[in-house]
Amino acid sequence: MWRKRLELRADKDRIIADVEKARERTMNRAVKLLAAKPRSVGELRERLLEKNWTNEAIVDRVIAKLEEYKYLDDQQFAADLASSKLRQRPQGKRKLLQAMSRKKLSKENVDAAIKSAFEKLPETDLIDRAIEKRLRLKGKPETLEDKKKFFDHLLRQGFDYSLIRDRMNDVAKVDLSNE
């Protein structure tokens, strides 16, 4: 599928016979795509340009019209995406940044969305939830190998190294005081 998209980018200056019909079809496709799930402007543009019956000029007009109707707003999309990702599964800033970079959003929108999402849900609360869940599922790490796996799991979730180290030390202290 990605090869098809690359091929279509090469002929983006297609000549369209009936511009009005192509604009209408493009608008209908855009509304259907947005009805299925929210998308960024970049994602929608890419999906619309896949079709042979449209070109860049028509897609630009359709996207401008959708922004005018408030169907497309990258800033709001980024904020909603960041907060929903954090609600679904606790993850660190690095993993969230990586997930949002796939959505073809501007760096400014991504940074602002991540900042506001982590103001609402601090990273320390998220890592505590992740640790609690991991302890519930796997139990307390007994061996050095288990501790390393636990640590690596939290790193893969995108949490900062120093934050993980501090929280793991806290978990070890709590375990020692309980015994």
Predicted regions and their residues:
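An alpha-helical, amphipathic repeat domain used for nucleic-acid recognition
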Residues: 1-179
